[in-house]
Amino acid sequence: RAVKRLWALILLLPIALGKTYLVPIEGEIDPALAVFVEQALARAEREAASGVPFLIDTPGGRVDAAIRISDRILQTPLPTLAVVQNAFSAGALIALSCRQIVMLPGSEIGAALPVVALPLQEPQAADQKVISALKGKFRAVAEARGRPVELAEAMVDPNLEVPGLSAKGEPLTLSADKAVELKVADLKAASLYEALQAAGFSPEVERLAPGPRVQVARFLTSSTVAGLLLALGLLLLLVELFTPGFGVAGALGLAFLALYFAGGWLAGLSGAFELLLFLLAVALLLAEALLFPGCGIAGASRAGSILASVYFTFGENALLVLSVA
């Protein structure tokens, strides 16, 4: 009878373990990707998955999105694993948030100096206040996961010199071998399958992928596309402001800004309030063009409405990105 019970437990073991849900974190870290990660973790928790490995290959991205992903990973009760192809900048914070880190051949982790990115301008290093705040976040995550705090901070602050690893003025970047040697990562693996086996995850893997809505949102909220839409939209509306009537410049400007806000809405960044502000700006634009040509009050009001809706949609963190300089 005892033997039968043992065999029954063995047969039920794969069911008890559940699936492993592989979540790819590829390309730029943006708000829509954060939505995808939250959805993936919610599904994994709902279906009692055996664990959630993240396949990370990113050059960086937005600070707010990276922190949002990091916080969600830290909150989940499920085992998490970072399988690192490249985890630069924002990717480093996400990798450090996982319970285990496995480095693939040729992978690197680090280089998390925050920069300020304005549309159509070269990124500039953030001020010391921002660096200090982000360094604190890296420190807190490293402490939570038992990683070397000093090395995590050195990934953010270029003024922290690590002898033999990084010179002063350069944020820390570690190769796969160095990351394992210094306990930033747990081990190296030759492939994703080997990484999953070594970390003790179920061999039954389902790779999750973002749906069409998230894919469109990722495209529209990427730093390049969102920056172009915002810059061109505001520029064309500025031209329309000094042009009698309502013409092509105004129509194109509104179209670009509509796409800009659509990306924020799809990514869950904007709601009814921001939409109402934008619609108010459109109403003022049409009122000035059709009813009160040349009225400066309407023009100033619509400009204020547009700028306010931009701010409330993306916030001040929209200017902060974590990327390889």
Language-model segment annotations:
Residues 17-217:
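Soluble extramembrane regions of membrane proteins in the secretory/endomembrane system
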Residues 170, 174-276, 282, 296:
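Non-cytosolic juxtamembrane linkers/loops
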Residues 1-6:
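Positively charged n-region of N-terminal signal peptides that target proteins for export
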Residues 258-325:
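Hydrophobic, low-charge alpha-helical segments
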Residues 134, 250-253, 299-302:
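Catalytic-loop motifs flanking and including active-site residues across diverse enzymes
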Residues 9-18:
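Hydrophobic h-region of N-terminal signal peptides that target proteins for export
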